[in-house]
Amino acid sequence: MRANVLKRKLSLRIKRKKRIRAKISGTQALPRISVFKSNRTLYIQAIDDVKAVTLAAVDGRKIGVKANKEGAKKIAAEFAKALKAKNIEEAVFDRNGYLYHGVIAVLAEALRENGIKL
């Protein structure tokens, strides 16, 4: 892809991210689940925006999974265990400007299947 196309895609994602973040916020009881997707792996974390603290986080590199749908299911299962250990059953899903499609959608569905209410 040409550089200007990539810059445009990134700027559109940043715009979506800002629009989403203006509307949602996490607390201790209802944390914000933020997702970051790179070409190689996924990162997911639960954030309390009031105290600006990360409550739980899972790094796909440490689990040894890739940024694909199967990896998203494994990361979601690990993350759900971490949340349940901290007695968190409900959260707000922040897709971080990514389209709710593919890996991001599978990740959200897998969290729901593992008992986290989004």
Curated annotation (Swiss-Prot):
The keyword Plastid does not apply. It comes from the Bacteria. GO terms for biological process: translation. Keywords: Ribonucleoprotein, Ribosomal protein, RNA-binding, rRNA-binding. One of its GO terms (cellular component) is cytosolic large ribosomal subunit. GO terms for molecular function: 5S rRNA binding; structural constituent of ribosome. Part of the 50S ribosomal subunit; part of the 5S rRNA/L5/L18/L25 subcomplex. Contacts the 5S and 23S rRNAs. This is one of the proteins that bind and probably mediate the attachment of the 5S RNA into the large ribosomal subunit, where it forms part of the central protuberance. Belongs to the universal ribosomal protein uL18 family. NCBIfam families: L18_bact. This is Large ribosomal subunit protein uL18. It comes from Campylobacter lari (strain RM2100 / D67 / ATCC BAA-1060). The gene is rplR.
